Amino acid sequence: MNSDEITAIMENKYSIDCVQLVLSPHLPGKGQKTHEGAGLISQTPNGSFLLKMYCSGNISPDDVLSRLDWKAGEIIHEEYYYHLTATDINGRQWEAKSIIPDIYLGLDTNRYIVHADIRELSYSSDLYDDVPAYSAAIYFPGDINVPFNTGVAVEKIVDGQNRSSSMKLNISKFSACDMKFELEKDVDWLTLNALSNTTIDDPLLMRMTESLQFVLARTLSWSIIELIHGKKRKVRVRSSQRNVVKSRVQPPIHFQQVDPSNKVWSLFGRYLSRTKGYTKELWHPIFRWIHAVIESGCSSLDTESLILSVATEGLLRDEFYNVHYGSAQLKTQIDDTRYIIAKLGLEKTFKDRVLGFLGNMLKPRAKDFLHILKDKNLVDSKLIEEYDKLRNSSAHGELADSSKFQIHLDRCAAALVLFYHIIFLAIGYSGPYTDYSTPGYPEKEFSCTGLP
């Protein structure tokens, strides 16, 4: 994909002129018709891709009216989905999945038009030269700020004469997980480039985008992914609106335009190292909570407080489930109590509830996990105290009192720092972070030494 095409996609002006389009049913043999014809795939002003194809042949009323069988609240059955193959005027073979066509009949009963929204398109092409390494380029639309560490020299040459020279700071270079990374900021997009001697597959691409979103505390959607290896190039293009800053949630490390020490990218590498072994094409369990917290910053402060509390508890349960809890004495006492209750002539339902309660005493609560970590000097007791106050009020639906707004803000900030500290422990990170629980937001050092 050339630079003009990339610019057109980022400006929502891209179109694919197709000499042949084929829409095939996802489940053959279900009576769904295959549609063929020429047409156009074009971007709408909001970044979506719209298919318009012109077909010939008879069409049944069932194909036109099939949507009338759908019921509100029910997931659309997969038999109604189609697979698209398209040949453009340059000979490239595009593919798209999970398409639901809309059919429009004309006055000529042997001709009809098909419209469809397309979420993602892809094509593969051959290269002349063999590229031994694996490379990936991910394009994110929008004005996305990152800390830079590399300048670019810009020269203005007129008639062979150098009229002026300047330096532009818009690139970051760093290494992580035996890969080389480079981020480049353009006017309307950010590009994340990765180079590796081992396979870069779809799950690893997800982990890379998660790492970037984590260190920036921003939800990001990509528009283009280009993968190159051997003599093959694969390009994926996706409907995506411009990424804009909506959340007030601050990143783990506050950054300026320049980051010569690469502290932000060190955290990027630590998260990637911890999560890259997760091979499902889903968000990593840690990132599910990170994403929830980032998105909570787009809502009210009360909503953010509640989600921060839930995310902290969920993260503790997911990542520290194997932490030793409960003394041998407690376990012995519970076993003795169970024995006594079992001998009593109690009604079965009541007895089962009491025994269940005793069993739960051996299952640590989120608060128990926090105190275990506190006893090992891994988290700050003051952060736990502020988190407890925030969690209790949020869980019981208590709205923030406007007269105590500063107190509520401070508790949210402390809860966010605690949330980040738990992530640091989960990924094994030691290094700088920004303490939003302290006025002035000083930078401090975190250590995961002593992690159980």
Predicted features by range, described:
Residues 20, 55, 76, 100, ...:
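A generic structural signal for solvent-exposed, polar alpha-helical segments
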Residues 199-274:
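Internal, Lys/Arg-enriched amphipathic helical interaction segments that engage polyanionic partners
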Residues 65, 218-239, 350-358, 433-440:
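Short glycine-rich, low-complexity/disordered patches
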